[in-house]
């Protein structure tokens, strides 16, 4: 029986059965980071969402059949401004932030994409597409800039499903007396005086650099061709970024539909307000790493809500994710778990537009099953289902011992445990209690055994 994967398509505003153009060559493009600042956890939601989508598509079509491209934007005005502010070179800044992004993705358990192109390495492709747009009268040169003529693009508002006036309400538009229309956007901009040489490139229109939107059109075309299956990104990219990508790509290649399925993840909020660098209410992934919050906890938090819904970041949500993982790891402790086929109900939850809240509930039900099982065989089956399902969504990649003792100085604790045993041996109950309480303050629980030994675990 053929697997049916239903995925919400922003373009049609409905859930559609995912049917790639070629089942042996499934193509997926996701907008990656602009590497000027350490990614905040809101940026990283996109990384986790599309990592899960990648895993599902691989499960259906096979790893060799799927090509996943996620770009790095390493040419941008924000990069120039921040490098100047920090007093570092462009390359120093972009290299440092790119490495931090990779560490963040590893921390969150994300698989590597098939290809990770950098914008600066594809300037020639961008120039070629811009030249096509000029030749087809979809772009024009004005005041040393190259602009895309928005009114020349058929169905420009299709993705956002709003009229042109509504789309541009509240959106900053760079005004220029030389533009044909106020909404026209930059494909190529000239270099400014005293700008870093490695942020500008030779072109038929003089020294300059590309606009943001043309970068993704060029890199997707280079690695996936005129048409591909999935384009992903945050909901904030629907307009103007993805709208402009569609317009310029379809106009450059008139027979192209560009991406068939458009997938967008919701915002991360803090106290109900969108998390963003401009608002200053953001928390970087590095902040969470420095607090020794395990990556699996953050990943489960990001998967706890449906990917299209807003998700509010708060300490309680992180604590709840930690408690859930503790419960799952406790359920498989001291059980000989084995990988089994993915349970049908679990897989069906993910095949229904990546319904991760239901998937998490199903794993919780298996954990409950372990604790109420009447036979060892039943316990083992439930525990095996837990680890199989959790592994599939990128969780529970440690042993229970590693999980519960992560970040713990075992040598230090064992020394205190032995010191307490000596105190008990000499009936120094006061010292024994002091050591127990000291460890309890450090969230280490001692359990005295009938044979006189003591075992410990992290709370």
Swiss-Prot record:
Motif ('HIGH' region): 33-43
Protein keywords: Aminoacyl-tRNA synthetase, ATP-binding, Cytoplasm, Ligase, Metal-binding, Nucleotide-binding, Protein biosynthesis, Zinc
Residues annotated as binding ATP: 277
Signal peptide segment: none
CC terms in the record's Gene Ontology section: cytosol
GO molecular function: ATP binding; cysteine-tRNA ligase activity; zinc ion binding
The record's free-text note on cofactor binding: Binds 1 zinc ion per subunit.
Record's keyword annotation contains Phosphoprotein: no
EC identifiers of the protein: 6.1.1.16
Motif ('KMSKS' region): 274-278
Residues the entry annotates as binding Zn(2+): 31, 216, 241, 245
InterPro entries: Cys-tRNA-ligase, Cys-tRNA-synt_Ia_DALR, Cys-tRNA/MSH_ligase, Rossmann-like_a/b/a_fold, tRNA-synt_1_cat_dom, tRNAsynth_Ia_anticodon-bd
BP term (GO), one: cysteinyl-tRNA aminoacylation
Catalytic reaction equation(s): tRNA(Cys) + L-cysteine + ATP = L-cysteinyl-tRNA(Cys) + AMP + diphosphate
Pfam families assigned to the protein according to its UniProt record, in alphabetical order: tRNA-synt_1e
Obligatory cofactor(s): Zn(2+)
Subunit structure, as described in the record: Monomer.
Family stated for the protein in its record: Belongs to the class-I aminoacyl-tRNA synthetase family.
Protein name: Cysteine--tRNA ligase
Encoding gene (name): cysS
